[in-house]
Amino acid sequence: MASQPPEEPAEFQVSDELECKICYNRYNLKQRKPKVLECCHRVCAKCLYKIIDFGDSPQGVIVCPFCRFETCLPDDEVSSLPDDNNILVNLTCGSKGKKCLPENPTELLLTPKRLASLVSPSHTSSNCLVITIMEVQRESSPSLSSTPVVEFYRPASFDSVTTVSHNWTVWNCTSLLFQTSIRVLVWLLGLLYFSSLPLGIYLLVSKKVTLGVVFVSLVPSSLVILMVYGFCQCVCHEFLDCMALPS
């Protein structure tokens, strides 16, 4: 197994977050306040003033040195940009000792003791307290989370759907059986029709005159009927066409 790289200490990560990524100086509560641009990058106020003095950005706009995103200045003042509240809290706690630093630099657990340590007579010049409010999610009990819960839902119309499906299956089977029977009957009639002439001759030879005449005359009579039907159909079409012509 490949060994994982050693993780950096939490104190080093916190100190790295408290440094400006341009001048690498530590943020403070005076000239180097952490300012947040619209692209969510943090730059100290002193570096922002230098960027404005260099004239690289248009009037009333600051171009982010990291992603070149333009941030509008509300009053053409760097002080109008929002501060990074989490870093301000860390800076305030850092002046009180390491025990005030939270485990997660983006979270601040509020307790009466911690609030008392933040607000002291030595901070009479401060007129605001920055607080990050987070919603704590309640963890479910281990007994419930370890056991999978499976719910079965049976709709009220389940029985009716089953009945309709069964009836549809029966109807399909009946329809298929009927179609098969019709096909078999048509094949039998066709076989009887085409074999009627030799069968009639055989019956005449066997001295069964009546049946022999019927079977022998079946094919010619059917052909005559078809010819008469076709002739009548042609006459009817011609008559209808003549009636449809304008007089």
Swiss-Prot record:
Gene Ontology biological process terms in this record: protein ubiquitination
Transmembrane region(s): 184-204, 211-231
Reactions performed catalytically: S-ubiquitinyl-[E2 ubiquitin-conjugating enzyme]-L-cysteine + [acceptor protein]-L-lysine = [E2 ubiquitin-conjugating enzyme]-L-cysteine + N(6)-ubiquitinyl-[acceptor protein]-L-lysine
Compartments in which it is found: Membrane; Cytoplasm
Keywords (A to Z) from UniProt: Cytoplasm, Membrane, Metal-binding, Transferase, Transmembrane, Transmembrane helix, Ubl conjugation pathway, Zinc, Zinc-finger
GO cellular component: cytoplasm; membrane
Superkingdom assignment: Eukaryota
EC number: 2.3.2.27
Disruption phenotype: Silencing prevents ventricular remodeling in rats after myocardial ischemia-reperfusion injury by activating the mTOR signaling pathway.
Single Gene Ontology MF annotation: zinc ion binding
Key word Membrane present: yes
UniProt topology in membrane: Multi-pass membrane protein
UniProt zinc finger (RING-type) residues: 20-68
Pathways per UniProt: Protein modification; protein ubiquitination
Subunit composition and interactions: Interacts with ATP6V0C.
Biological role stated in the UniProt entry: E3 ubiquitin-protein ligase that mediates the ubiquitination of ATP6V0C and targets it to degradation via the ubiquitin-proteasome pathway. Also plays a role in the inhibition of TLR-triggered innate immune response by mediating 'Lys'-48-linked ubiquitination and subsequent degradation of NF-kappa-B component RELA.
Comment field on protein domains: The RING-type zinc finger domain is required for E3 ligase activity.
This protein's name: E3 ubiquitin-protein ligase RNF182
Species for this entry: Rattus norvegicus
